[in-house]
Amino acid sequence: YLAGSLPEFPGIPGSTLPTSLSVPSFQQKRLLFNRLGQPGQVHVYRADCRAGDRIRVQMLVPVLPVGGAVVPAFAVVAHSLPYSADVHKLPFTLPAGLSAVVAPPPTELVTPVADALTSVRYYPGPTIDTKTLVGGRAYIVVWSPHNHMGKYVLQIGNRWPMRWTYWAQIPLFWWQIRGWFGLSRAAAYLALAGIVGLGALTFAALRGRKRAKRDAE
């Protein structure tokens, strides 16, 4: 489920639309790993969109070994969305000309899902799937209506990465995601030790073969 999404670990976004944190795109599949670190904190991300661009956002609630996750609300804000819902639930007053779709926190989390690549677990949360009617700047707003703190994950976008460089970085992504979840990365050390050991055996075998060839001559 997480494979195909570019993981990003941004800094703390601003809490208003003018101070929002820029994201390269809301179209390419990305995973935003972040944390609400204070009661009442609001995170706002922004990206430029064209008319007709699809904006898909899903909240993922991480299952952490020692707790510390949060189940926040989130919203998509932009000019002239096809529909607007629950705007009054936003943590700030919306400027004129903007519309929003708000996804409140789920009432319950039923069954966690395990990611096949990293073995991390998370609860799939609500999804907003909309599109922009006009070009301009769009925003994703994250906050906790109950002033809770903790880690959260946003999966945004719908376009799969096509560059080979993404797939070449899968081991790095595995390392980063496991570390953010607070899970063991011992498997990476074992794999590295195995590669080093295999390389040493191969090198020794080649040296032995060359030595035997010289002795035969």
Say what each PLM segment does.
Residues 2-19, 45, 66, 72-84, ...:
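C-terminal edge strands of extracellular/lumenal beta-sandwich accessory domains
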Residues 5-8, 22, 89, 93:
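Selective for proline/serine-rich intrinsically disordered segments
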Residues 17-20, 29-32, 113-115:
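Short secondary-structure boundary micro-motifs
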Residues 23-49, 54, 59-65, 73-74, ...:
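Non-catalytic, beta-strand-enriched accessory regions in extracellular/secretory proteins
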Residues 57, 69, 85-88:
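Short, conserved acidic/polar surface loops in the N-terminal third of protein domains
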Residues 64-67, 92-98, 149-150:
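A short local loop/turn or secondary-structure capping micro-motif enriched for an aromatic residue
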Residues 76-103:
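Alpha-helical transmembrane helix bundles of large polytopic membrane transport and channel proteins
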Residues 94-131:
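Extended, solvent-exposed segments with strong compositional bias
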